[in-house]
Amino acid sequence: MSGLIVYYSYKNHTRLIAEKISEITGFDLCEIETVDDYTDDYDMLVDETVDNLKSQTKPELQLLDKEISNYDTIVVGSPVWWYTIAPPIRTFLSSNDFTGKTVIPFVTHAGWPRSAIKEANKLAEANGADVKNPIEIQFTTDHDADDLVTSDDDIKSWIGSL
């Protein structure tokens, strides 16, 4: 089985989990980057993205350095923004054909995941994916800390089930 981890990370929380998955599984890593960068100021980001999220704007993405057609399993990681997946992940999931592929979504959040994982599942399934083993991974509410609320054992157990 060939595996790829595709993720978008704003404050490195999602990146940390993606790297842990890669370390344990040996899956390749691929970070999604937008053509136009988001601001580094968190408060400005909130203001900047709330309208985009409501309108489900899909930002333009830079070309990936991996070809998803070469993989059977794709793990997709997103931070939760305003109770949903980040717009770059929305773009990725809605603009790729996942027919014949297993997609395994994970989201990182600070306590308010609401329907983010369901949205990721729905978008992947709408594009042909067989969605399996989604998970929500919680960090503390301190946006600058890398402290997990979800236990490391739970995360490792989930990774082992991939």
Task: Give a label for each model feature.
Residues M1-V76, Y83-I85, R90, S94, ...:
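N-terminal beta1-alpha1-beta2 submodule of the flavodoxin-like/Rossmannoid cofactor-binding fold
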Residues Y38-Y42, S115, T141-D144:
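Short, charged, surface-exposed secondary-structure boundary motifs
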Residues I68, S94-K101, A124-N127:
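Short, conserved loop/helix-junction motifs that constitute active-site signature segments
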Residues V76-G77, P105:
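Redox-cofactor binding/interface segments in oxidoreductases and associated redox assembly factors
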Residues V107-W112:
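Short beta-alpha junction loops
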Residues A116-E125:
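Short, aromatic/basic amphipathic alpha-helical patches
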Residues D130-L162:
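Glycine-rich phosphate/pyrophosphate-binding loop and the adjoining helix
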